Amino acid sequence: MTCNHRIDRRSFIAGTFATGALVAAGAAVCGCSAGAAGSGSDGSPAPEGLTADPKPAADATLAANDAVYALLDFSDERERAFATRGLIAAPEALEITDDVGKVVWSQKAYAFLDGAEGQPVGAPDTANPSLWRNAQLNHLFGLFEVVDGIYQVRGYDMTNITFVRGETGWIVFDPLMSCECSRAAFALVTEHLGERPVTGIVMSHPHVDHYGGIKGIVSEEDVAARSIPLIVPAGFAEHAVAENVYAGNAMGRRAGYQYGTFLEAGPQGKLSIGIGMGQSTGTVSYIAPNDLIAATGETREVDGVLMEFHMTPGTEAPAEMNTWFPQFKALWMAENCTGTLHNLYTLRGAEVRDGNAWANYLMEAKARYGAEAQVTFQSHNWPHWGNDVLNEYLVNTAAMYKFIADQTLMYLNQGLTSNEIAHLIQLPPALEQSWYTRQYYGTVAHNAKAVYQKYMGWYDANPVHLHALPPEESARKFAEYLGDANAVLAKAQVDFEAGYYQWVAEVTNLLVFADPTNEPARLLCADALEQLGYAAESGPWRNAYLTGAKELRGGVDADPKYRATGSADIQRAMTPDMMLDYLGILLDADAAADLDLVVNLAFTDEDPYVLTVRAGVVLYERGAQADDADATLTLPRLGMFAILNRDEDAQAKSIQVEGDPDVVRKLTEHLATYEFFFNIVEP
């Protein structure tokens, strides 16, 4: 390679994909032998011995996981020391239930991580040793002291909940995802630190695991009666609602893959997701914030505690902020510095994040507070103490995101595609070998793709890919050209034994999309995904691989308990604009192609709107009414839910119609109903 890092694509592809080399980002074996997967003679028998049972780690997986011990210093116990430091109290076992006894959060499910007399259990063959170590540290739960006056309850949900002692009560940071979990955490604090009221709440950013448990510690009535400040970054409310509504159904289904919702915890199942032990499944709530922070340097004094806020929009969330506590010399880093490589793109789906901005905000935090800070702490994982330690922590974390952003841009400017770059970039040893820069949540590979997407979008400029065939149609033509499917499977079986799991997964999944009833293809694809999962260092990658394997073997488990139902509180926070946008999303344009309506919406508690439906499209104007409207609907803002939910009883109670009496029926008869349990690894 020359000094300007110019890459010959053909050499790169041949060297990377054909070797079956260990991919450092996921510690997974990948490769291909595309030339060996051609057509075979008609009538070849299917490979024997394929079953729907989970398999042990294969030889190549064993080798990949064993190589991790040579890569990382497992004698370095500093992160474990930080994770255990300051423990005040913890129950012997932790399982949190809702009002009807359903388990919504369990650390008992991960008891297999515990060793005798507190000694850690060694990693099994079916787990990447680095991820196993992370899971053991995230399995720690209880009440911890950060400094005198700042306390965290960790391991009671995916997120940490933080309690800052004021003169009369607690200022709470990020009240978890579920009310049941935050209530249990607050009870633990009260038991060991005394009874004190909540006197303020800071929610660092609008992801549900950082605000959904708010009603477990306060009520709306309490907030109003005691004027409790609910402090958030500007833009919090809009993003909190929009992210969970517009693409909520698809995000919810995909989140099941990311978080391992359908998997049992265990050595062959789900472990840590890198920033916690998965998502709780309790009651999600929302209370509208009442104090917005708009600019870095703004301060608030709540219950005698002075806080200075550092705005970091476009990092881990579109609206996010760090907090500096000068009297404690403590720096709260929200979810911007979490002891692992985070996501520039999240597998459940979301807008991509800006790696360059993320790095710059971390360096800005260091410049503003690094000279004085004695501890950094955040919403996931554990604090880091010591001025030298935390400054190095901030710099190394910033360097990860900056490296990925810069190197992706360097290679894309040489013409490499997103997928090529993802297989090429690897963190330098100075970054890769630190325990807090490991790829437990995000990976270099999919973060590089996020950078490519941010700057270049989905298109790689190859016109062959400009309007590619849908996967099912393409797969059928591939299968037709390949010929005898059993001959393809026989060759795939050979490649499986050689450890080319990614290629085997790709070619067998092609056969599945061509014919979903091809059971040998399904089972071999599942086996390949399973081995990729066993070797993955990223918790979400492991979950995705193992969930795909599970669904190929047994189909989609459509048990309603797995369905992401959303939060009524979040839905009630929707503005009229959001509701009307969502009406347009729900409208089946083909079915409503001939529908032509103009409707006045006379909200009793909001500005009026004119709603136009034309050519299958919903358009609206705020602050207007049409003289020639087909009808006028008088309703409260929340009455729109009667339309969106097609609830005729609620419509009759909440909506007054003047004009066309059938207008509500016309608006709702072509609204789509979403199937939550849609297929992912098969057509």
Task: List each language-model region with its residue ranges.
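Feature captures hydrophobic
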Residues: 36-38, 43-46, 491-494, 500-506, ...
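Conserved beta-strand hairpin/beta-sheet module of binuclear metal-dependent hydrolase folds
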Residues: 136-196, 321-325, 329-335
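N-terminal pre-domain segments of enzymes
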Residues: 43-134
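Metallo-beta-lactamase
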Residues: 145, 169-170, 177-180, 194, 231, 236-313, ...
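N-terminal secretory signal peptides
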Residues: 1-11, 18-30
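Active-site metal-binding motif and surrounding structural segment of the metallo-beta-lactamase
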Residues: 168-169, 180-231
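Divalent-metal (often Zn2+) His-rich catalytic cores of metallo-beta-lactamase-fold enzymes
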Residues: 49, 53-63, 340, 356-420, ...
